[in-house]
Amino acid sequence: MKALLVISALIINSGTFLWAQEVPATEKPWNFGVDANFYFIPDDFLVLPVFKADKNKLHLEARYNYEDRETFSAWAGYNFMGGKKVEYTITPMLGGVVGLSNGIAPGLEFTFTYKGFEIYNESEFLFEFESIENNFYYQWTDLTYSPNDWFWFGISGQRTRLYKTDLDVQRGLLAGGAYKSWELTGYLYNLGFDDPFVLLTLSISF
C-alpha cells in the first residue's frame, strides 16, 4: 500500500509540474490513442493494452502487462516537438509500476521522421522496490519505411521480460497499414530461431 501511495503522489505531482510549465494562449484539444498488442507466443497468449493522452506539451500514458504480467504502470511526460526536414517528437517520462513488479521507472519515447523513413523508440529503466536484482531495462524500437500514407514496413527489436528466449533482444520484421483513424501492424519475431512468435498491434487515435 505504501508503494502504491508513493507512486500515485509522484505521478500526480509530475503531471501537475509539467502542465504548469506552459499554458499557450490558444489551447489545443486533447489527442488520445489506444493500442492493443496481441502476443501470439508458443503455448501462450497475451494482451498488452496501452492508453495515451496528449495536450500541448503534456503527455500521459497507462500500460498493462508491459513491465510484467498482471502489472499496471502510469506515466507523465513532456513533449518536445519540432524539425523541418527531420521532424521529431521526444518525450522524457516518469512512471510508477504496481503489480507483480513494483517500482519507479524513468522512461523516454522518441520519433524521428525523414521523408518516408521513421525510427520510433520507447525505453525505460525499472527500479524495483523489492530487490535491486530485479531492476530491468526495457526497449522497443521500430525502423520503418512508408512508400505512401497508408502502408509501411521495416524491422523491429524488443527487450522485455514478458517472453524469455536465448536472445537478449527479440528481433523481427514488421508490416502495417492504416485506414482513417485505425492502424494495424503485424510483427514476426525471431524468425529462423527456436521460438518465433507473432505480435499484432491494433491502434486507434481520436
Question: For each of these PLM feature ranges, what is it?
Answer:
Residues 61-62:
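N-terminal carbohydrate-binding/catalytic regions of secreted carbohydrate-active enzymes
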Residues 46-48:
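Conserved internal helical-beta-strand scaffold that buttresses enzyme catalytic cores
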Residues 21-29, 81-88, 150:
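Short loop/turn motifs that connect adjacent beta-strands in outer-membrane beta-barrel proteins
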Residues 1-29, 206:
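Cleavable N-terminal export/targeting peptides
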Residues 72-96:
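Glycine/small-residue-rich loop that forms an oxyanion/phosphate-binding "nest" at active or ligand-binding sites
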Residues 30-31, 38-44, 57, 66-70, ...:
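Outer-membrane beta-barrel transmembrane domain signature
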